[in-house]
Amino acid sequence: MSSIFETVKLFKSDDPFIIPKNILNLDSFEFDGLEGKTNLREMLDSSYTDAFVILKDSNIIFEEYQNEMKDNDLHLMNSVSKSFVGMLIGILEEKQKLNSKDKLRKYIPELQNSAFKETSIQHALDMTAAVKFSENYLDPSSEFWHEAAVVNWRQDLRERNSPKTLLEFMANLKETSQKEFEIFDYRTVLTNILALAAERSCETKFQNLLQTYIWDKLKAEYESHIVSDESDFPYMGAGMNASARDLAKFGLMLMNDGAFNNEQIVPKNWIKSTLEGSIEHKDIFLKSEYGLRLPGFHYKNQIWVGNPETMICIGIYGQAIYVDQKNKVVIVKLSSHPCLLYTSPSPRDNPASRMPSSA
């Protein structure tokens, strides 16, 4: 990724944490897919898998790489990136660097005359802001693709007067499509705004905050590269790249209520709040286009929550971190799916394919 696009870097640890292994042969392990019974080997070989890691009781019990990917290779995470932002906001709130009830414009005054004038940090965290923003990946002219063009993902959409930075793009959004906290509507721009609010609140580059408060604490084995705009501001809505093992450590942290390697990284009450949501969160999720597709789910703090003990971080082309606190299981799947997962011609073997087309 760094050879094609501008990126910023998170550095690996000088003393990396190595997850212990207890490898099992799980090829024939059966489970219920969307089209009936399947097994792990069939799922892996038919769902464009690049990397797949299972942890049980904090040990790696299965690890496999396909399509010439190796354990030290970095993979585009797409929207899995968002969950790192959500957890960092919780850390900064505990450190009193910001308050999730505050309006975004308190930290980003350039948004005073934009669609985000009344949007709070929490509204952005929960994807309930008022801004009109199409996340339709199938529409080449949607706002999602115009934002992605800022980091050169769609150079064909860039014109002489196009925004040069993500901040400029955000400030140019003027229209709203709903009231604040009226309905859940998934929009990548909200994650990028959160990253900028974090940066402004600490007067420190976002990538440095992520390095200090999360990446260093996870004792990462490998670097992470994040696609960035011309100002070196990272495209955190979808642009982070990391190894499967380092993502597994992030999953372990979530599984252990924000703790990793005997250190509390994310506040325990932030994880608790994420998992529990509220009646209002569940109601506005149910009223959204996602409600019928994901019954019982809610979305809070940039995490998809299936029940009070299960969290999912997910990217649209087959990237996911699945966290099951009750059973002490973490699963990382990194894929290069050719289709949006929800519209995939063969989604039966990938639980993430239950997700709608904007993730």
Annotate each PLM feature.
Residues S58, L76-S100, A124, L194-A198, ...:
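Active-site SXXK
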Residues L76, K95-N136, N172-E175, V189, ...:
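Active-site helix/loop module of the DD-peptidase/beta-lactamase fold
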Residues M127, V189-A197, G239-A259, Q319-S335:
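Active-site-proximal alpha-helical segments within enzyme catalytic domains
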Residues I60-E64, R105-K106, P140-K179, T204-E223:
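Short, charged, amphipathic alpha-helices and their helix-cap/turn boundaries
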Residues M1-K70, K97-L98, L125-D126, A130-K132, ...:
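N-terminal leader/targeting segments and the immediately adjacent pre-domain N-terminus
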Residues A220-V227, L275-V330:
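Active-site Gly/Thr loop motif
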Residues S353-A359:
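Hydrophobic alpha-helical segments, chiefly the membrane-spanning helices
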Residues Y342-D349:
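Conserved small/polar residues in nucleotide/adenosyl-binding loops
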